[in-house]
Amino acid sequence: MRYLLDTNICVFFLRGKLNLDEIIKQKGRQNCFISEITVLELRYGAENSVNIEKSNKAVDLFVNGLKIIPISSCFKIYGVEKTRLRKIGRLMNDEFDFLIGLTAIANKLTLVTDNEKDFVNLIGLQIENWIIRK
């Protein structure tokens, strides 16, 4: 199985709340990807952190270890899926989440997210949550 890591999963890792390195090792680094959108969101988060330089270095290290999937891969399905969701009154509130979900679908990747409810209306999207709550 191949995985697209949602931004919230990456943030859990960067904050030290998820042993993502170990999980990626188990799943196979070659099977784990991030979207260009996730890189944008991580950069924004780093620029708004208390220690900008440290946060940007952490993002650099993290991003350099994974293959980045371009959002252009979902261009063909974007209009079709957004129109479908609009017609049923279920447009996603977050356009970035929408693009991440479509990127997973277009590339036949399982989306790893802690926000499963945000993606329930996307047809054909496989979802996993690697966050274990006790």
Identify what each model region corresponds to.
Residues 1-34, 46-65, 134:
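Short, well-structured N-terminal submotif of metal-dependent ribonuclease cores
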Residues 1, 101, 105-134:
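Acidic, PIN/NYN-like endoribonuclease modules and their adjacent C-terminal/linker elements
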Residues 49-53, 85-87, 129-131:
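Short, hinge-like loop/turn segments at secondary-structure boundaries
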Residues 36, 53, 72, 93-94, ...:
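Non-catalytic, surface-exposed connector residues within folded enzymatic/regulatory domains
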Residues 67-112:
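Active-site neighborhoods of divalent-metal-dependent phosphate/nucleic-acid chemistry enzymes
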Residues 9-10, 38, 74, 117-118:
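Alpha-helix capping/helix-boundary segments
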Residues 6-7, 42, 78, 104, ...:
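Generic structural signal for small/hydrophobic residues in well-ordered secondary structure
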